[in-house]
């Protein structure tokens, strides 16, 4: 019941249909499956994805798990994220870039207008990773999560929406290989052992702080 209720709430927030929302045990899994859904069945060359050089290992791991080559883009010190110019340079150097992930590190808006314009011009799969930037407003007035072909949420510890663990994928772009149509993949519930660990995490954390 809670599972379906959360999917409906997210569908309402991001203005999509309920069947466009997928829930997983981690945001990392959501990133991998979003990227995998865009690889045609007859794909031969390894695709690449542009990501900010200031990122966590989970994003890199998710990209590699999906079979993509991560292309790290230098950041602007003011935004802690790459800008449109660096994305344009990367596309000239790496024509196999098929996707781009934006993160808005620490809740600071990136150069979204230029990045989106370039992504659309090159038909890149644009993913908004909102692990640290849920509900921020971009300079042009749009809310984070309102423009990506895919939107990623992480419910892990230290994220914008913290439930100890979990992740969500909101898909606005159709899959190229029907991957997400597989009921064994779409919205998988965590193992009982993982659920118990997550429920007791606050107790263990409190115990560790008290006796450290």
Where are these regions (language model features)?
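Phosphate-binding glycine-rich loop
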Residues: 4-48, 57, 62-64, 72-74
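A short beta-strand submotif of the Rossmann-like class I SAM-dependent methyltransferase core
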Residues: 23, 51, 102
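Conserved AMP-binding
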Residues: 53-55
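Structured binding elements
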Residues: 67
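Active-site phosphate-binding strand-loop segment of PLP-dependent enzymes
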Residues: 79-186, 190, 196
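Alpha-helical membrane-targeting segments
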Residues: 187-212
């Amino acid at each position: 019941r809670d599972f379906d209720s959360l999917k409906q709430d997210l569908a309402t927030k991001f203005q999509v249909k309920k069947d466009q929302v997928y829930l997983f045990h981690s945001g990392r899994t959501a990133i991998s499956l979003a990227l995998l859904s865009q690889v045609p069945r007859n794909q031969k060359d390894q695709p690449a994805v542009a990501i900010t050089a200031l990122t966590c290992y989970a994003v890199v791991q998710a990209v590699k798990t999906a079979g993509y080559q991560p292309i790290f883009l230098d950041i602007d010190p003011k935004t802690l994220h790459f800008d449109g110019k660096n994305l344009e340079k990367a596309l000239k150097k790496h024509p196999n870039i098929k996707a781009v992930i934006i993160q808005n590190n620490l809740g600071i808006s990136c150069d979204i207008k230029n990045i989106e314009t370039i992504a659309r011009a090159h038909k890149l799969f644009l993913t908004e990773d909102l692990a640290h930037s849920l509900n921020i407003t971009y300079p042009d007035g749009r809310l984070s999560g309102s423009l990506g072909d895919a939107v990623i949420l992480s419910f892990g510890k230290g994220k914008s929406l913290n439930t100890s663990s979990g992740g969500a994928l909101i898909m606005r772009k159709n899959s190229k290989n029907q991957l997400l149509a597989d009921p064994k993949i779409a919205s998988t519930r965590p193992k009982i052992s993982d659920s118990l660990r997550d429920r007791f995490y606050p107790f263990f954390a409190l115990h560790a702080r008290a006796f450290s």
